[in-house]
Structure formats: structure tokens, C-alpha cells
């Protein structure tokens, strides 16, 4: 029997899983239908499609990891299961973070203005640059996950120690120790895409500040299309970076949870908050993206008409 706290954890993580799968699945479906109709896919749709696929994978791995680690910690002490979960989580996690950084870079290149030669070249070649970045993101994520799998598969010391322990909690604490160095290192390295996102955000803010300063000289009265585009992009990136930061911090909490006395509570809290990022941000993308929002409105309108008739 599960405790009341376990039942609350199951309800919350199940709700986040459903929201995340439906939200990200909807984005992918809309982009896929648009791709079929137009026989081509835009750069932003390409980024979003790759992003939501990585998030669906990440949410699935995180839910499985959370349920096993919180509700069945004795099962998690098995070496092969830990290696499989950690490898897939690392791959999906890095894909998600780098695709998110790629989305921020796209917003920055598309909307911001700068006279720097490198920026102008990247802006002209934005479609080619983004596709190479996406390919690079996949290569980096695959390489890191393979390194994690190799490192963990060669470290079986915890199994020999854990099998002499009778207490499940002690087994869990012992089993996490060999994973501390590689997983913590790669969790800390994941700050690189976050820094890339921050740089893109500040470049966009700087561009808006300079653009607003120039507009004041002409006193046109009202915001021009460029200003509106800057504001929309900054709103989107602000929410994205907030969720990104929250996810990164809670991922570290999960990685260091074995150091906390009540590790089970820390792990459950970390998993629930971390899943908010890939699940909740999909809803924000739907609201802020004109095409996705209009498609959802049309779908709801058609459903309402069908119900009436």
C-alpha cells in the first residue's frame, strides 16, 4: 500500500504526464499537418517539432524514473536498470536543453538587429545555421549519453556493497555514490545551453533598447511592427528561460538528493517540479504562437458546433 504522500505524488506526476504528452503532441501534430499541406516545413516549425519530440521522450523517461525511484527504490538498485534510465534520461535531457537553446538563438537572429558582420551573416543564413545547430545538438546529446552509458557500465562497485545491505534506504544511498561524479559533472555541463539562451535573450533586449532609443527621435506615437516583434519574442524567451532555470535547478536537486536526509521527499519534489518545464511550457508555446493558438481555436469551435448539431 502506498502512503498518502505517495498517492499525491502519483496524482501530480500522472497529471503532468498527460498535460505534457497532449500539449507537445498537439504542437507536433499541427506542424506535421502543416508540413503535409505545404510540402515543406519552416525553420521555426522544424525547431519546435524536434523540441516537442525530445520533450515527449524526456517526460516519459522522467515519469518512469520518478515512479521507480520514489515508489520502488529497491528495484532501482539493479545495475542494468539504472544504466538504461540514466542513459536515456541524459540523451533526452541534453536534446531538450540544446533544442531549447536553438529556439532562443532563432528568436534572437530573427528579431534582433545588429551591425556586427558575424550576426548579419548568421541572420542571412539562418535556415542553414539552424539546421546545422539541430544536427550538432543531436550529435552532442548522443555522444554524452554514450559516455554516460560507458562510464556507468564499467562501475559495478555499488552492487557488491548494496547486496550486503538489508535496509532499502541504505541500498539506495550506497547505489547512488558511484553515479555522483559522472552524472553530477554532466548535469553541471548542461549549464552551457542555458548560458547560450541567456546570451540570446540579452542580445534581444539590447536590440529592443537600441531600437526604442531610435524611435524616440522620430516620435511616431505607438509601437511599430519591429517593436511588437521584439516584445513578443522577449515575452516568449522570458517564460522559456524561467522554466529552463527552474528545470536546471530541480535537476541538480534530484542529482544531489541522496545527500539529503529525507531523500524520498526531495526526489519526489524535484521530479514534480522538473516535469513542469517540458509539460507546462508546451501550453505557453501554444498560447503565444499564432498558428498553434489559431489551430486550437478552430478545433474547439468545430467541436462546439459538432456538439450543438
Swiss-Prot record:
The keyword Ion transport does not apply. It is a multi-pass membrane protein. Keywords: G-protein coupled receptor, Glycoprotein, Membrane, Receptor, Sensory transduction, Taste, Transducer, Transmembrane, Transmembrane helix. Glycans are attached at residue 167. Pfam families: TAS2R (PF05296). Residues 29-50, 104-131, 206-239, 288-309 are cytoplasmic. It is found in: Membrane. One of its GO terms (molecular function) is bitter taste receptor activity. GO terms for cellular component: plasma membrane. The chain crosses the membrane at residues 8-28, 51-71, 83-103, 132-152, 185-205, 240-260, 267-287. Signal peptide: none annotated. Belongs to the G-protein coupled receptor T2R family. Most taste cells may be activated by a limited number of bitter compounds; individual taste cells can discriminate among bitter stimuli. Receptor that may play a role in the perception of bitterness and is gustducin-linked. May play a role in sensing the chemical composition of the gastrointestinal content. The activity of this receptor may stimulate alpha gustducin, mediate PLC-beta-2 activation and lead to the gating of TRPM5. This is Taste receptor type 2 member 8. It comes from Papio hamadryas. The gene is TAS2R8.
Amino acid at each position: 500500500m502506498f502512503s498518502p504522500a505517495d498517492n499525491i505524488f502519483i496524482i501530480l506526476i500522472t497529471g503532468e504526464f498527460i498535460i505534457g504528452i497532449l500539449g507537445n503532441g498537439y504542437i507536433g501534430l499541427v506542424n506535421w499537418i502543416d508540413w503535409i499541406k505545404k510540402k515543406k516545413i519552416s525553420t521555426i516549425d522544424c525547431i519546435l517539432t524536434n523540441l516537442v519530440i525530445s520533450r515527449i521522450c524526456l517526460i516519459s523517461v522522467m515519469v518512469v524514473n520518478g515512479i521507480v525511484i520514489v515508489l520502488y527504490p529497491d528495484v532501482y538498485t539493479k545495475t542494468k536498470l539504472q544504466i538504461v534510465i540514466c542513459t536515456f534520461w541524459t540523451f533526452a535531457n541534453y536534446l531538450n536543453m540544446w533544442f531549447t537553446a536553438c529556439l532562443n538563438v532563432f528568436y534572437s537572429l530573427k528579431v534582433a538587429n545588429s551591425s556586427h558582420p558575424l550576426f548579419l551573416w548568421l541572420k542571412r543564413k539562418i535556415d542553414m545555421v539552424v539546421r546545422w545547430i539541430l544536427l550538432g545538438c543531436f550529435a552532442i546529446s548522443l555522444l554524452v549519453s554514450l559516455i554516460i552509458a560507458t562510464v556507468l557500465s564499467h562501475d559495478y562497485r555499488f552492487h557488491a556493497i548494496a547486496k550486503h545491505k538489508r535496509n532499502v534506504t541504505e541500498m539506495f544511498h550506497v547505489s547512488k555514490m558511484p553515479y555522483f561524479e559522472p552524472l553530477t559533472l554532466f548535469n553541471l555541463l548542461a549549464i552551457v545551453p542555458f548560458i547560450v539562451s541567456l546570451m540570446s535573450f540579452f542580445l534581444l533586449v539590447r536590440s529592443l533598447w537600441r531600437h526604442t532609443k531610435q524611435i524616440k527621435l522620430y516620435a511616431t506615437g505607438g509601437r511599430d511592427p519591429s517593436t511588437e516583434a521584439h516584445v513578443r519574442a522577449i515575452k516568449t524567451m522570458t517564460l522559456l528561460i524561467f522554466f529552463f532555470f527552474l528545470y536546471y535547478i530541480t535537476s541538480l536537486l534530484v542529482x544531489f538528493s541522496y545527500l539529503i536526509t529525507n531523500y524520498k521527499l526531495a526526489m519526489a519534489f524535484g521530479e514534480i517540479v522538473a516535469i513542469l518545464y517540458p509539460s507546462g511550457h508546451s501550453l505557453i508555446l501554444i498560447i503565444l504562437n499564432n498558428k498553434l493558438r489559431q489551430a486550437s481555436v478552430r478545433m474547439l469551435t468545430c467541436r462546439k458546433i459538432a456538439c450543438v448539431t
